[in-house]
């Protein structure tokens, strides 16, 4: 009986936490699906295809395109 109560409380807590931390529950999925559909129609728009600078290449601290971190204008 105690285990059942603990499980119910845990499920309710996790459900409430999911709704509380959601970005935009009103149209979040609609935007997500439209972005995914756009990326399927235009593969160049996918963020997975973006190039990043490798280790030791020059970078801008504010607009970093490094694969790792940009420290003192050099990618690490």
Swiss-Prot record:
It is found in: Secreted. GO terms for cellular component: extracellular region. Expressed by the venom duct. InterPro entries: Conotoxin. Keywords: Disulfide bond, Ion channel impairing toxin, Knottin, Neurotoxin, Secreted, Signal, Toxin. Residues 1-22 form the signal peptide. Residues 23-50 form a propeptide. It comes from the Eukaryota. The presence of a 'disulfide through disulfide knot' structurally defines this protein as a knottin. This is Conotoxin Vc6.3. It comes from Conus victoriae.
């Amino acid at each position: 009986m105690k285990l059942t109560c603990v499980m119910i409380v845990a499920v309710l807590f996790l459900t409430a936490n999911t709704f509380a931390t959601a970005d935009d529950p009103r149209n979040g999925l609609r935007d997500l699906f439209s972005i995914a559909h756009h990326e399927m129609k235009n593969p160049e728009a996918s963020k997975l295809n973006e190039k990043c600078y490798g280790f030791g290449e020059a970078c801008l601290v504010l607009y970093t395109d490094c694969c790792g971190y940009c420290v003192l204008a050099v990618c690490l």
